[in-house]
Amino acid sequence: MGVGVAVAQGQLRPDISTLEAWQSAVLRASAIFYTHASSGRYIHGLLTSMGLWDKVRSKVQRFDNGEAMLLSLSQAGTPPGAMAMGAISEILTFAHRGVEWVGPLPSAIAHQTIYALALDLQSPRLGPAQACVHVCQQADVWGDVSRTGVEPL
């Protein structure tokens, strides 16, 4: 699951096509939203390691989760030029709900969080768990799932 950028509906979509363009967009943003979740920890690490943190610290707003972040971004009081960075799957669920998808982080800093399924062979619910794994292995399911920002490995 990748990390991407969003803006409030109707706002200018910043150029984030390269590392330099993303850095410039971050510096120009009026507000920067990200979460305390894994994607937000990654963004915070980027800002720190790239020497941007001291320049943007006053503009950063962190949220407990992607839903809270994106709801805030979509509100009427959000300053023009605000940008949110988070899990692509969360951003895409808010498309057409006051949030516009800008795109994934540029390839130089792209980040994927990998999730895996595992079965507990001692589980009293092993049958339903095996059925879930079976569904997840079906190629025809991934067309729908990919539209949510989740990609199979």
Language-model regions: role of each:
Residues 1, 6-153:
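Exported/periplasmic ABC-transporter solute-binding proteins
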